């Protein structure tokens, strides 16, 4: 069995780790960084860029550069939060064929699972490059408050990327694993996870290798992206007041504002003030306009105060569900890049009445925890038991549109529960089972996960047929539902696929597309390497010919020039094999050139060596005689 890797698929950055010598190790990517921007771009040449290369060209290619796609995964296009995001990003969010929110880039529509799969492929390649072997199994993290549709979409992304996802693990739980792996004493901890796009809070009890989640809560649309948006809105408003121009209508300006906002936010974690300086941000009839604005830490804290306060409501709910008070928490573990912000730490400290634990790297700890879980599944990590929970209540719609809970939130998973229901009308021969997830009392106010029909019920008065509905939640938090007519034994079962979601056919097509992209990427890389090698050899050989001039035999010179011309012709095309073949042929001829040069030098040395030796010997004799005469004279 090959290595199982742990991947933190983040909104802003992603990270991959693996177990080595009993400890999780974060793997550096090709650019030498330990985290990779979760950004995918498509150039006008249809080239796909992932990570730092994609981020570098975002300003000049904003419409085709996709970031923060995790906020769209498993979401419907008509979802109010999707609508809000549509106005804030420079790329296009469109309605997928299944009604989900998709993105448009490079003239093509992509599902969020596909874009996430491209990022996962990059993580997979990073691990394979380090390990020197193929990797096809992974543990992937998701926000604890992700619903079933979002978890399933993340699992689909893994499949599209060519990975078997052994486990979907909650991010705060993964962080707790990394934090508590070497701690055996019993502790109650809170994991406060404020990342790039989501917020989670989990309360856990840790002791003797058992990690038991007591409660979890969160907000899947609250994170660093929202902090950036506040700064962008502030800068745009200030500029509009001064110049009368609305920068939010200009996609290029919006992307520049976003990058400046993120930079300012990071700088204000260590500095009291920072200057945003964006020359030539736009222009009007009077000429070019520049944006120059100084932002203080106090100003930033004022802008985002409501966002930080929003994190406290889920914290209070999680504590109440766990049956503990803030004072009962032994350690508060801070996770996610946004927890570096001094104001966030201050608010958490005031709420819990203790200094938060900052001994873990907030950007890497989740991937490390995923690697530990991978080690547990592989059998490399012993005596660790992870007991996670389902974040939201699950149930079905019953008479009057009421949401009837079958499994309450914060139930330890995996779990299974059955309940018997009946028909609402006389002689009803079919029932529709509509499955919902959420905490509201009416079904319509919760998230519809899916529905299916149980048909062939024998005619009977209402209330007589006995229909047993069974909910089964696996360790990934993914739901299976079945309905069985106890009278006839007829059964209908579904693995919940969101009312949108990707079908098996969609996934298979996307797997093939991803493989094609991988093949295209490989071809581009091989072509670039071949052209570099060919170009370099042509340059070296031509320089040698120039330096040697008439010293080269005419026949050899003609042969070398012909080989150089053949490589130059091949370099104009895209055929890797042809370029390599002609480069190799030039290499053989260039060796003859080097050999001829060496033989020529050797011949020249032999021709000049003899007279010099004789002259040197003669000089010695004269010196000796001269010395002797001198001595005699002195006598």
Swiss-Prot record:
Biased composition annotated in UniProt, kind: Basic and acidic residues: 604-618
Pfam families per record? HSP70 (PF00012)
Top-level taxonomic group: Bacteria
The region called Disordered is annotated at 597-635
Q: What induces it?
A: By stress conditions e.g. heat shock.
Q: What is this protein called?
A: Chaperone protein DnaK
What HAMAP family would the database entry show? Answer: DnaK (MF_00332)
Question: Which GO molecular function entries does the Swiss-Prot or TrEMBL record give?
Answer: ATP binding; ATP-dependent protein folding chaperone; unfolded protein binding
Q: Which PANTHER family is this protein grouped with?
A: HEAT SHOCK PROTEIN 70KDA (PTHR19375)
PTM-bearing positions, type Phosphothreonine? 198
Q: Which family does it belong to?
A: Belongs to the heat shock protein 70 family.
Q: What is the species of this protein?
A: Zymomonas mobilis subsp. mobilis (strain ATCC 31821 / ZM4 / CP4)
Role summary: Acts as a chaperone.
Write out the entry's keywords from A to Z.
ATP-binding, Chaperone, Nucleotide-binding, Phosphoprotein, Stress response
Question: Which residues lie in Acidic residues bias regions?
Answer: 620-635
Concerning Gene3D superfamilies, the annotation shows:
1.20.1270.10, 3.30.420.40, Actin, Chain A, domain 4, Substrate Binding Domain Of DNAk, Chain A, domain 1
Keyword Aminoacyl-tRNA synthetase assigned to the entry: answer is no
């Amino acid at each position: 069995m090959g290595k199982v890797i742990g991947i933190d698929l983040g909104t802003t950055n992603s990270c991959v780790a693996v177990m080595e010598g009993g400890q999780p190790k974060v793997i550096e990517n090709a650019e030498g960084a330990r985290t990779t921007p979760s950004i995918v771009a498509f150039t006008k040449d249809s080239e796909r860029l992932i990570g730092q290369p994609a981020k570098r060209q975002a300003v000049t290619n904003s419409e085709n550069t996709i970031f923060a796609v995790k906020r769209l995964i498993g979401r419907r296009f008509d979802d109010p939060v999707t609508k809000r995001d549509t106005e804030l990003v420079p790329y296009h969010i469109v309605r997928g064929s299944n009604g989900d929110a998709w993105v448009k880039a490079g003239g093509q529509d992509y599902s969020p699972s596909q874009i996430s799969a491209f990022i996962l492929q990059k993580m997979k390649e990073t691990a394979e490059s380090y390990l020197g072997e193929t990797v096809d199994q992974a543990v992937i993290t998701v926000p604890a408050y992700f619903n079933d549709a979002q978890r399933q979409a993340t699992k689909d992304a893994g499949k599209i990327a060519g990975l078997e996802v052994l486990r979907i693990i909650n991010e705060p739980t993964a962080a707790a694993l990394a934090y508590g792996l070497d701690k055996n004493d019993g502790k109650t901890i809170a994991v406060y996870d404020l990342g790039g796009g989501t917020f989670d809070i989990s309360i856990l009890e840790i002791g003797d290798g058992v990690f038991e989640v007591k409660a979890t809560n969160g907000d899947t649309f609250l994170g660093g992206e929202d902090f950036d948006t506040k700064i962008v809105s502030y800068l745009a408003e200030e500029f509009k007041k001064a110049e009368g121009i609305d920068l939010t209508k200009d996609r290029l300006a919006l992307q520049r504002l976003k990058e400046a906002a993120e930079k300012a936010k990071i700088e204000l974690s260590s500095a009291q003030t920072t200057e945003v300086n964006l020359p030539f941000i736009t222009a009007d009839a009077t000429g070019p306009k520049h944006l120059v604005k100084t932002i203080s830490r106090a100003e930033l804290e004022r802008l985002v105060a409501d966002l930080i306060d929003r994190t406290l409501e889920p914290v209070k709910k999680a504590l109440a569900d766990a049956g503990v008070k803030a004072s009962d928490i032994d350690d508060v573990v801070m996770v996610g890049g946004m927890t570096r912000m001094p104001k966030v730490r201050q608010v958490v400290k005031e709420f819990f009445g203790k200094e938060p634990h900052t001994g873990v790297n907030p950007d890497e700890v989740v991937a490390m925890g995923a690697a530990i879980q991978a080690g547990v599944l592989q059998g490399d990590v012993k005596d660790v038991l992870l007991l996670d929970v389902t974040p939201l209540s699950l149930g079905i719609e019953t008479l009057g549109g009421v949401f009837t809970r079958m499994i309450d939130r914060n139930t330890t998973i995996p779990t299974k529960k059955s309940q018997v229901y009946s028909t609402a009308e006389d002689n009803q021969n079919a029932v529709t089972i509509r499955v919902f997830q959420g905490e509201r009392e009416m079904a319509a106010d919760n998230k519809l996960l899916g529905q299916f029909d149980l048909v062939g019920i024998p005619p009977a008065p209402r209330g007589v047929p006995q229909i047993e509905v069974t909910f089964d939640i696996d360790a990934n938090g993914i739901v299976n539902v079945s309905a069985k007519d106890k009278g006839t034994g007829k059964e209908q079962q579904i693995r919940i696929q969101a009312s949108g979601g990707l079908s098996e056919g969609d996934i298979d097509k996307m797997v093939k597309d991803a493989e094609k992209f991988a093949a295209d990427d490989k071809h581009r890389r091989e072509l670039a390497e071949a052209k570099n090698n060919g170009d370099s050899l042509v340059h070296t050989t031509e320089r040698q010919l120039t330096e040697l001039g008439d010293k080269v035999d005419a026949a050899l010179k003609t042969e070398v020039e012909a080989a150089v011309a053949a490589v130059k012709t091949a370099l104009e095309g895209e055929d890797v094999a042809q370029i390599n073949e002609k480069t190799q042929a030039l290499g053989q001829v260039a060796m003859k050139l080097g050999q001829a040069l060496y033989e020529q030098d050797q011949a020249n040395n032999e021709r000049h060596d003899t007279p010099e030796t004789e002259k040197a010997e003669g000089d010695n004799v004269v010196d000796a005689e001269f010395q002797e005469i001198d001595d005699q004279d002195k006598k």
